[in-house]
Amino acid sequence: MLNTLVSRFSAPGWAVALLWLTLLGVAPGCNSSSPEPTAVAPPTAPPPVAPPAPVLVGSSLIGEYTPAELAARVSNIPLVGSLARYSVRVYRLTYTTQNTDGRPVTASGAVLVPVAPAAVPVISYQHGTLQPDEETRAPSYYSSRSEIWSAVSVLAATGHVVSAPDYIGYGASKALPHPYEHGASLASASADMLRATREFCAQQKIGVNQKNFLLGYSEGGYATMALHQLLEEKYADTLPVTASAPGAGAYHKSAFARYIMNSTEPLNFLSTYVWVLRTYDRVYQLNRPLGYYYQQPYATRLQTDPFSAVPQQAAELFAPAFRQAVLTSSDPALSATLTANDVYDWQPRAPLALFHGTADDYVPFFNSEDAYNAMRARGATKVELRPIPGGTHFTAAPTYTLQAYAFISQF
């Protein structure tokens, strides 16, 4: 959406000069018995701000795909294929980012470039949860099983460059553990991929404008929210957010943890919460024995295989003392790790739409509702809550993609 330009007028140069002379006591036609003013040295100009160090390491072409090929990939979603206007070239990028310990690491991602005649916006697309045995679903492989293969490729074909980070732990950094649902590293890896994408476009003379849109669902929704916050805090001038549309993310981690520990219903997602706990224990150096978190025999099983099957009842899986510590916030270090990964309570400046299925039992709807209420309470005027009625975590995903595209198309 175009902004109205407002003209600004300044005083004519002679008036400014006269005012300056008057302030010095030497205005024309004025006599003064005051001593001659001491010459004042002009203020020293601030040193030039050094541009940020480049992050792009390398690139390689994966392939080029026609609108007809891309449309065929989404034939099961009505009308989506008709949006594909341009052929799309897909590249694999490697770039430098920081791991959770602050050390530099080479990461990777995919860039989807429409063969378009004019400069286009950039979408940063953050993918959802990938289990360790789903490595080849990471964006830089561009496999037919990846999120970016179908609908996201069509988004590129509408006239958007798409920046799709693998995240740490996949692609070029697959030897490292993925910091699952760790807000800070998901945000920095995504921001640095966005920087690398724009560096690549400049290098290859690919026309992009200044618009940056942020999309992602599930873990990608959480990463998108964390990325939006980071960009507005650290990159407001160089990577301004035009609009973002996170979907079904676990934004209110501390409340989500209490919800799990209070639940008496079967929870299908407990294995992923085990992964979150393992990540936070490692990243924040809590170094608790597994017996602190889990009852037997699951503590022993998870020691042997971190991704072994766990029961669906929280009371059966988690140690009673641990459950109580979460519910009463009686473990300050643990509580601090959860709060550090809350990304729901801040004031976004750019337009933000929160999409979430109302019947989501994997990442409950209250995560988006809490974010909306907290942001509005802080004075955010451009945040919207977009419920997907009756949608579960999985059935709402196609609707999210279509509605998120419609949302960003306004800007």
Residue ranges of predicted features:
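Histidine-bearing beta->alpha loop at or near hydrolase active sites
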Residues: 359, 380-400
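Short alpha-helix in the alpha/beta-hydrolase fold that links the catalytic acid
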Residues: 109, 227, 350-352, 364-375
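Accessory cap/linker subdomain of secreted extracellular hydrolases
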Residues: 247-345
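Alpha/beta-hydrolase active-site loop
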Residues: 180-202
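Gly/Ser-rich "nucleophile elbow"/oxyanion-hole loop immediately N-terminal to the catalytic nucleophile
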Residues: 113-116, 195-215, 236-239
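Catalytic-loop region of hydrolases
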Residues: 34-118
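Short, surface-exposed "cap/lid" segments of acyl-processing enzymes
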Residues: 100-108, 112-158
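Short beta-strand/loop motif that positions the catalytic acidic residue
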Residues: 348, 353-360
